[in-house]
């Protein structure tokens, strides 16, 4: 369900889809595993359990939730998801942050000297330097990121155990009606995690070179959407076949185009854009 170019690609595709129901990557993930994946002869999708499907649906508007049946009910009734889904939610967020630290350092967009002022990174940096003063910088960074992840996981497990005991949760229904998430970091670690997020937003995501890449991503996604909406016959056969039942339905066409673009990798999207716009490229 994640578009090429991450959040910038998602925002661009959502803008393109405004007249056709919009685009939410969590809904697209659910659509992929329920409908788009073709692995079985007797049914579409992957036949995943309810709990897995609910965990995929991290965010959802009330309008869309009403169309999803049981899996969307918690957004309407304002109940909590299962513990599995709560774990997945925080695991995804932590994985993104730590990956972006590693990626930002390797790309040179952020520097170790800056990150040392961020508590979550700085504490692990000091410990790694104390234990392994002579290791290469690239190995040191990997070790710091690994320790950051371990630090977060240990705190999450220990604090969540306390939350579950305090809530007296003994069943799925207890979890759903707890009134709050029962999986979470302790307040000090949560504050450290938020500090890292703020740093990444200010120093990495708004870096001028990242902003340039974001703009390129928006152009590629928007151009691809426009080309295929103007002439859906340029879609690959497996996508074009889905339009034969309603060839004049613009909304159906837009959804198929969005499915195609959302399934692309960054590299594939750039290559497809080049094939469609560069006269020297083979189509």
State each model region's role.
Residues 19-20, 70:
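Generic structural signal for short, solvent-exposed loop/turn connectors between secondary structure elements
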Residues 27, 32-41, 45-283:
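Histidine-centered, transition-metal-coordinating active-site segments
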């Amino acid at each position: 369900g994640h578009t090429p170019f991450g959040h910038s690609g998602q925002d661009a595709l959502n803008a393109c889809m405004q007249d056709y129901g919009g685009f939410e990557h969590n809904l697209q993930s659910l659509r992929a595993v329920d409908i788009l994946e073709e692995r079985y002869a007797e049914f579409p999708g992957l036949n995943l359990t309810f709990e897995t499907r609910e965990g995929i649906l991290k965010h959802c508007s009330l309008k869309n939730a009403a169309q999803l049946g049981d899996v969307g009910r918690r957004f309407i009734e304002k109940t909590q998801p299962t513990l599995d889904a709560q774990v997945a939610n925080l695991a995804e967020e932590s994985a993104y942050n730590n990956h972006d630290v590693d990626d930002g350092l390797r790309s040179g967009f952020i520097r170790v000297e800056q990150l040392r002022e961020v508590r979550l990174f700085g504490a692990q940096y000091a410990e790694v330097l104390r234990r392994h003063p002579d290791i290469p910088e690239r190995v040191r960074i990997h070790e710091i990121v690994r320790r950051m992840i371990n630090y977060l996981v240990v705190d999450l497990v220990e604090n969540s155990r306390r939350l579950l005991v305090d809530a007296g949760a003994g069943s799925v229904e207890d979890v759903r009606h707890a009134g709050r998430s029962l999986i979470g970091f302790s307040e000090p670690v949560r504050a450290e995690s938020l500090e890292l997020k703020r740093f990444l937003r200010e120093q990495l995501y708004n870096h001028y070179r990242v902003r340039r890449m974001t703009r390129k991503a928006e152009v590629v996604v928007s151009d691809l959407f426009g080309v295929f909406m103007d002439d859906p016959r340029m879609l690959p056969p497996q996508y074009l076949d889905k339009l034969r039942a309603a060839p004049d339905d613009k909304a159906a066409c837009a959804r198929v185009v969005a499915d195609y673009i959302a399934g692309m990798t960054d590299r594939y999207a750039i290559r497809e854009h080049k094939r469609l716009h560069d006269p020297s490229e083979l189509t």
